[in-house]
Amino acid sequence: MDLFDHQLIPVRLTEERQSQITFWPNWFDGERADRLVSQSINDIDWRSDVIRIVGKTIPIPRLQQWFGNPETSYTYSNIRLQAVAFPCWIDQLREQIEIQSGERFNRALVNYYRDGSDSVDWHADDETELGFEPLVASL
């Protein structure tokens, strides 16, 4: 399947002025998705951070890395992530997402949930530095 197969029709999953979700089913074929997961696991210099919840410091049950302009950072829950420059393969993926979506993306938080015990509870990504109504692409 061509990555930009014109048969891909976005499906709107929510109403306007709420969390708007557009879903492109089968945007990647299984082989390409498997390659991207493998490359992510092996090539990203993953961070393991801790978070303070109800007075306890615990490891965040996932690994993560923040990509973007190296002069920028992202802070949530008192965790400051200094941006790492996009590797070429993630930058190419970002460009493909921009073409498909018609939107621009300048940074990426990449998460690695290692197994069934890694997870993050329901939460709001409402940091002011993300701006009003931030746009998120999720793969």
Ranges and model annotations:
Residues 1-138:
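Non-heme Fe(II) oxygenase metal-center motifs and adjacent flexible, charged/small-residue loops
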